[in-house]
Swiss-Prot record:
GO terms for cellular component: extracellular space. Residues 124-137, 194-221 have a biased composition (Polar residues). Residues 141-158, 222-231, 240-254, 264-292, 344-355 have a biased composition (Gly residues). May act as a soluble regulator of keratinocyte differentiation. The keyword Secreted applies. InterPro entries: Dermokine. The keyword ATP-binding does not apply. The lineage of its organism: Eukaryota, Metazoa, Chordata, Craniata, Vertebrata. This is Dermokine. It comes from Bos taurus (Bovine). Homooligomer. Seems to be able to homodimerize and homotrimerize. Residues 1-21 form the signal peptide. Residues 293-303, 319-332 have a biased composition (Low complexity).
């Protein structure tokens, strides 16, 4: 029970120690070391006392079981000084070992507390300030500057990320706004909530250099900013990020505390987009290795060292008239502010305007050709008739049907003969020539026999093509009558021949 109580006290002490270290919002390392040392000593002493008591209790119990005398025997009340000194020495060594273990636990606890304070520091430092820009003037509230010892590490992404929102001018939510040292404190200037602090977002005019919502169409270049608003990239070689120069770089911050502390671009460019990674612009190389491409709204704005002596005309080639000349102008452009003529940006409009001129000239050429060669129906109709020369257009125009040509007659005659050949079940001779009755009588088998008075009617039907006459039917139904007629001279015939007396003569029988 005593061991459990000691462990409970130890846990309570650890909780109190961690709670004591949690309010370290200012990040004072000395306080953190003191708290860690106190925790280490507390852990060592507590473990030493607990284990020492447990060892003494175990020894007393073991000796008591061995001798059978547990009443008057105890290490604390031992009369033998040598035994007491030996046990005390061993317990002291064990206590020192436990204290060393506690020191190690102190270091671990210190690291844990430090890592625990970092996120708390981040969240505390990111709370909105009075100006709605993550603290007053971009600084953390209550004057916090991050945990000491984490400053000065240029671009270390792993150890000093607690300074994401405290270093650099015009940052963009931890994107290392200007490529400067992450752990470097400094005044923030106007804070742009876009992806780039240079006003060089690919969306024209959406991100501005100084977060100015006024309706003016011009922006002063600032100290040393000879490049003006040339696409947000200052290849002039004279603007060292001074006061929002070079197309609104640094978002209006002062040059001394801008995000490129320690690098200052070597008198170089504006670090458009803040992607220079800790001042990699060395030696005035106008974003040399700073990966200005992509963050600037125009192509050709990265590594424009060739234009470094031309007054910042880094926009010599700007394929998009809307990107580069408007971006970084420092205002939200109005319709009358489109394509402002700024220093170094005048050449940026040449290519787009010339391309537009070419397109317009091509359209004008097409329109001129269309207007000169308007649609003429007479010409079209004449060309159409010339392509259909096999048609007698003169006869069609006069409304006269010309006699069919010999070739057409031969063609249709051949089609007719083929059709008759493919339909042998029809008696085409009777249909086309009108065959006499004797052949029909022979085919029916009733020629020269008595009782053939009805055949006259059949003959009249065949000659006159009158199929509706009522009379004795012809014996042509496929069932030939007997050679000898029945009594009374009546010839037997089929039901079909009786129903349709004159129709069956068109059918050929074999």
């Amino acid at each position: 029970m005593k061991l459990k109580g000691s462990l409970a006290c130890l846990l309570l002490f650890l909780l109190l120690g961690s709670g004591e270290a949690s309010p370290l919002q200012s990040g004072e390392e000395n306080t953190r070391e003191e708290v860690g040392e106190a925790i280490g000593h507390g852990v060592g002493e507590a473990l030493g006392d607990v284990l020492g008591e447990a060892a003494i209790h175990g020894i007393e119990k073991a000796i008591g079981q061995g001798t059978g005398k547990t009443e008057g025997l105890g290490i604390r009340e031992a009369r033998d000084p040598h035994l007491g000194d030996a046990l005390a020495h061993k317990l002291k060594e064990a206590s020192h070992a436990l204290k060393n273990t506690g020191s190690e636990a102190d270091r671990q606890a210190e690291n844990i507390i430090g890592h625990g304070v970092d996120p708390a520091h981040k969240s505390w430092q990111g709370t909105p300030g009075s100006n709605g820009a993550w603290g007053t003037n971009g600084q953390p509230p209550s004057g916090g500057h991050g945990i000491p010892g984490s400053q000065g590490s240029s671009g270390g992404p792993g150890d000093t990320q607690d300074q994401v929102f405290s270093g650099g001018s015009g940052g963009s939510f931890g994107a290392n706004a200007q490529g400067g040292s992450w752990g470097q404190g400094g005044h923030r200037g106007a804070f742009n909530l876009g992806a780039n602090s240079q006003g060089t977002s690919p969306q024209p005019g959406s991100v501005r250099s100084n977060n100015n919502r006024n309706t003016e169409c011009t922006t002063p270049p600032g100290s040393g900013g000879s490049s003006g608003n040339s696409g947000g990239s200052s290849s002039s070689g004279s603007s060292t990020n001074g006061g929002g120069s070079s197309g609104g770089s640094n978002g209006g911050s002062n040059g001394s505390t801008s995000s490129n502390s320690g690098s200052s671009n070597g008198g170089g460019s504006s670090n458009s987009g803040g992607s220079n990674g800790g001042g990699s612009n060395g030696g005035g190389s106008s974003n040399g290795g700073g990966s200005n491409a992509g963050s600037s709204g125009s192509s050709g704005s990265s590594s424009d060292t060739r234009n470094s002596d031309h007054g910042g005309s880094s926009q010599g080639y700007n394929p998009s008239p809307s990107s580069g000349s408007r971006v970084g102008s420092g205002v939200r452009n109005k319709p009358e502010c489109d394509n402002p003529h700024v220093s170094g940006g005048s050449g940026g409009q040449g290519q787009g305007s010339s391309g537009e001129g070419e397109a317009v000239s091509g359209i004008n050429t097409l329109n001129s050709q269309t207007s000169s060669e308007s649609f003429n129906f007479d010409t079209f109709w004449k060309n159409f008739k010339s392509k259909l020369g096999f048609i007698n257009w003169d006869a069609l125009n006069k409304g006269q049907a010309p006699p069919p040509s010999t070739r057409a007659l031969l063609y249709f005659r051949r089609l007719w003969e083929d059709f008759k050949h493919n339909t042998p079940f029809l008696n085409w001779k009777v249909i086309t020539e009108g065959e006499d009755l004797p052949s029909l009588q022979k085919r029916a088998g009733g020629a020269g026999q008595p009782g053939t008075g009805w055949q006259d009617a059949v003959a009249g039907t065949a000659k006159n093509y009158n199929y509706n006459q009522q009379g004795p039917p012809a014996a042509l139904g496929g069932q030939y009558p007997a050679k000898t007629p029945a009594k009374g001279g009546v010839t037997v015939s089929s039901s079909a021949s009786r129903t349709y007396p004159g129709l069956l003569q068109w059918v050929k029988f074999w």
